[in-house]
Amino acid sequence: MARKGSPASTEAAFTRSATLRPDSKSAQTRERILDAAAHVLSLKGYAGMRLADVAEYADLQAPAIYYYFPSREDLIEEVMWAGIADMRAQLASVLKEVPADVTPLDRILIAVETHLRHELEISDYTTASIRNAGQLPDNLRTRQLEEEAKYGEIWRKLIKDAIAAGQIRPELDRYMAQMLVLGALNWAVEWWSPKRGSLEKVVSNAQSFVRNGLSPAG
């Protein structure tokens, strides 16, 4: 499917029905529908996502979608949850592999790169989740908000560790710093395209911005 595939993490490989084996034809069809919905939602948004477009992209008849999802809203809710859940799992996995001697501030910069690459290059699900977060009614955001809180906790620890190491300016409010950084990273889905520069350049500029904005030497 498209430029970005399904969520890679086991945790975010969706709440498949217990009757569907992951390798079964039904499970594969369900995943195709989710992939297609993520792609369409990332491009057209909550208001513009039609099941007919999802079906066309998934190479299915639209009524087939209802076998797997009771409604359009159920499908959207699953995509929105999966996008954040997978990004959280990806960041946790990346940070787990970072050598112990890497400084707390550099761990933040690694998180910056992981976030940007995931939302801009790896996952339509994450792009859709970030781009549509403010458009969904509250009843569709319960699981997404829970995942956002867990993702934010990873960043809180990163910033807390950097403060303890003296690598963040003491006058900065840690919560505001975190929200400003994440807000800037999330906004990249709205303005970036390869025509505006390579993803590598976006990452390096963002890392420089964050380092110089947070560091006492900045």
Q: Residue spans of the language-model regions?
A:
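Amphipathic alpha-helical packing segments from all-alpha helical-bundle domains
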Residues: 82-93, 118-121, 128-131, 138-165, ...
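Helix-turn-helix
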Residues: 32, 40-74, 78
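Hydrophobic alpha-helical connector segments
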Residues: 78, 92-124, 174, 178-181, ...
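Generic hydrophobic, amphipathic alpha-helix propensity
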Residues: 29-37, 54-55, 79-91, 155
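N-terminal intrinsically disordered/low-complexity leader segments
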Residues: 1-28, 98, 218
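Hydrophobic alpha-helical segments that form the core
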Residues: 3-8, 170-190, 201-213
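Amphipathic, non-transmembrane alpha-helical scaffold segments
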Residues: 26, 34, 76, 80, ...
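All-alpha amphipathic helical-bundle segments outside canonical DNA-binding/catalytic cores
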Residues: 103-109, 142-147, 164-180, 197-205
